[in-house]
Amino acid sequence: APYWYYLCDKYGIYLEDEANIESHEYYYGKQSLSHVPEFRNAHIARNMEMVHATVNHPSVVIWSLGNEAGPGKTFVDCYNAIKAYDTSRPVQYERNNDIVDMGSNQYPSIAWVQGAVQGKYKLKYPFHISEYAHSMGNACGNLIDYWDAIESTNFFMGGAIWDWVDQALDKQDPATGKTYWAYGGDFGKDNKPNDGMFCMNGIMRPDLTPKAQYFEVKKVYQNVGVKAIDMKQGQIEIFNKNYFEPLKNYQIVWSLYKDGVCVKKNQPLQGAKNIVGPREKGIYTLPYDYAS
């Protein structure tokens, strides 16, 4: 939506703008539409319509050729068409790293990410996970394990969660009068019910109220990280995840609990605001007599 681009421009949110292309059922085999000459112009048109529509938005920093639509030469032509118009932004296309400017993959394991940030694989940099953390059901519980690895380096750009919001409609049960979120077989052909729910993958409900995953994502993605280093000595590490801003506008306080009872509450942590600059870490000692 245009308003989303406006908000990203205003608040400095980086956008990867992706062409509306996905031929998932054909996927990466010989039947992929990316190999079919008759679909070449349609692929290029969709990419260029995207570029023409949003090229003047400063929040758009990456172009994406599409998603899960095959490895054919058509996408080389799409890349060349974009570059002939705009050379100021890198172009990515999931997994097809040899034809674009940056690297990506989908749904890697945590172990793979831990190896990747240590330089164990031959990757094209900058690198990001173009799709991960499928948010269906009770999901995203291991998100912190991905980000402990990702945040250990500055050349791994993170990833894109599948996806933002559950896609369902408010519907009324004629028998009870109660409303519910309808999806899949609730609109089945010839009134044939099924449990297909592959549209319910979001971290938000259809009415944009948060699900449990939302709060996990918010915590993991927060701009300031805090990690225990040696709690017997009261030592913690503060990581300023921002790339441009120091912590001067943050109020950092700490509380200490013993067996669930608060013994120190909202104590200011002096010095951290002025010391921790962008992408810097600092170790601080909480002033408390732990021997007592």
Where are these regions (language model features)?
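Carbohydrate-binding surfaces of carbohydrate-active enzymes
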Residues: 149-292
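Substrate-binding/catalytic cleft of secreted carbohydrate-active enzymes
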Residues: 1-200
